[in-house]
């Protein structure tokens, strides 16, 4: 009986994990609600694990890996 209970609990957790992927390419390119970031694995969150482009963020990403803008040019003299 204990083995059956354990197996049932394990399968329930497995199904819950599989259906928890709710954004990005794993979920028809859906975006997260409330401006949360979508991780590379299809989960919504607000920490760097979800939001960093370097970590594979899919949508609503912040920072992490952009090349940055070029600096302004030096002032030119008259010809």
Curated annotation (Swiss-Prot):
The name of this protein is Morintide mO2
Q: What does this protein do?
A: Chitin-binding protein which functions in defense against chitin-containing fungal pathogens.
According to its UniProt entry, this protein's organism is Moringa oleifera
Q: Which residues form the propeptide?
A: 64-79
Molecular functions (GO terms): chitin binding
> SUPFAM superfamilies in the record, alphabetically?
Plant lectins/antimicrobial peptides
Instruction: Please report any disulfide bonds recorded for this protein chain, giving both cysteine positions.
Output: 23-38, 32-44, 37-51, 57-61
Provide this UniProt record's keywords sorted from A to Z: Antimicrobial, Chitin-binding, Disulfide bond, Fungicide, Signal
